[in-house]
Each structure stands twice: as structure tokens, then as C-alpha cells.
Amino acid sequence: MIKKECMTAEWIKAISVRNKYKDLNLIEKVIRAMSLLEMLKLSGCPFCFKGGSALMLILGESAHRLSIDIDIICPPGTDIEPYLKDIEKFGFISKTLEERQQRDTNIPKSHSKFFYHIAYKNDDKPAYILLDVLYEDLQYHATEEVEIKGPFIELDNEPLMVTVPSADDILGDKLTAFAPNTSGIPYIKGGRDRSLEIIKQLYDVGKLFEHADNFQHTKDTFTQIGKIELQYRGLPAELSLIYEDIRETALCLATRGQMGKGDFNMLQSGIKKIDGYIYKGKYRIEEAIVDSARAAYLATSIEKSSTRIEKYDGNLNTLLAMELSPSVNNKLNKLKKVLPEAFFYWVKTSELLQK
């Protein structure tokens, strides 16, 4: 389990110095989120850990984005309340819990806030960690057990294990979320700007793309979750809507708003905001264009029933004979010199669309 000293100001500040990352608030939130995860595991709650925070465990040292919410899936009909009783033992002072149906959707969720006293500064106002529970049968084809550990925490014994989707499965899940006009996170929700959340999905798709190696699992999970998300939103159960949405959003990024159905200003805003959540490196528009090209290629590969995906090998000679098919706009040729990897995936996308 996580050592108690990890929730002290001294520890949080030491972690900040060690990682050259200044946001003490986010460091503490990551530690508290992992503590909440330990509580859920020890309570016996039946769950699968998913979402951005799960990627910190799935990707290990390759995970450079911090996530501070705990997203889990529980079987339909689960009563979550009995599993949330030991909050004081895990550093929390109170909680709120509400069952809800999200507005304008039929998504069965519960939403909780777990409050704690801030350790790194003297402040009477408590902070909180969010727990989102989705009550649904698992749509993943493979799960695995991973250790609860990370660069911000230290353990006093063997790490606890939690169930997470495979990298291939969660890639399919995340890909459906990068479709802001259909199955994914919308630009605006409840009057709030959600551009940061959209870009978080894109960033995760890019990271997972580098680790996934079972395209069939990615394809199957995308297909199942995509249909469910369309149903939740009252949209026709036509996956073609999602494929097109992903490509149009990627095209909007690739041409910096000149083409594609998307809100480039909001996407650009999300790219600027995500930097605060990345504790190693930066995420710029150029990286987002590459990741969105990967997303477009993945979505099109699923649409066209490909059996495998090809990955760019970094060799510029690979691009010499490559040309865009007429199925995509030739303005994307500009990527060949400036972002060769993005160009590679747009060529592959265009070839699939041309068939």
C-alpha cells in the first residue's frame, strides 16, 4: 500500500523537485487518486479500472500525462455505496455520492467526490478526487492485472493489483472518444468548454498506438463501444458517422482549420491546456497533427476491414514514392516535408478510402 508519508507536504515538494514538475496540486491529486484506487481494491468492489488514470499503470514509464479522476466499470446493478465506507483510512474526510443519468443521454453512471485536506499548503478549503462509475457489462476482449505503482508514490509492501483493459482494447475505446460530433467528447457540454478533454483522448490514442499490437482487439472494441455510445446519444447506429467524424476532426487539425468539420480554435485551445498535465516533455500542434493522422488511419482501417495496421518506420526514404490518392485533399501534401509521419498515415488512409 501507499506509505502515509506520501501524503505530506515534504513528500509532495520532494517529488516536484525530483521530476522537475512544479504543479504541487496535480502531484497531490495523483497520489490521492491512487489511494482511492487502493481503497476500492481492498473493499472487494467488482470493477475494471479504465480511463486516463488507468493509462498511468498500463503504460508505466511511457505514461507522461497525469490524470486525476478514477473511472471504473462495474456490473449492471452494482450498489457502489458499501464499498466506499473506509474513506478515513485512506486519507479522505468526506464524500458525496449521486446516482445519475447524464443529461440528454441514457448513460447509467454514478458520480462521487472524495474530499481531503490539502497537504502542500495551509488551506481550510478541502480539495477532492472524482470517482465515475459506469454500470455496464465489459466490452473489452482482453483484460490484464497491473500493479498500483508510479513515480509519485512509494509503497510499504507488495503493490496491489487491479484489472485494466489491454492496451489494444483501451485504444479502441479511446478512439471512439475522439469523435466530438458523434460518439466522443463534445466541444461544449453543459455550457462548459471540453476542448481539453478532447485533446486528452487524442494524446492517449497517440501513446496507445505505439504500444498496441493486436489490431483485431482494437477493432472489435471500437465497434462494440462505438455502437453503444451512438445509442446513448440517440444517434443512428451507423459506425460510418464515427469514422467520418474522426477523419474530419483530424483533417481540421492537419490543415489548421482550413478544411475539415471541426472547431480548430477550440482544438488548439485544448492543446495549450494539456501541457499542464504532462510532466515529461511538451505536446504541441505538430504532435497533435501526427496523432490525429494515426487516429484517422486507425478509424479507416477499421471501416475498411483491414486485418493489420502499418506503422511508420522513421525512414524518410519510405516516403519518396508515396503519393496521396484522390480520396483526400491534396493540400495534405504539405505534410510530406514538415511532418512526414503524419503524411505517411494520411497516404495510408487515402489508399484505403480509394479502394
Name these PLM-found stretches.
Residues 1-48:
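Helical scaffold of the NTase/Pol beta-like nucleotidyltransferase catalytic core
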Residues 74-108:
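Metal-dependent nucleotidyltransferase catalytic core
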Residues 37-70, 74-76:
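Active-site nucleotide-donor binding segment shared across nucleotidyl transfer reactions
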Residues 56-58, 64, 81, 139-142:
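Short catalytic/ligand-binding loop motif for oxyanion handling, primarily in non-cytosolic enzymes
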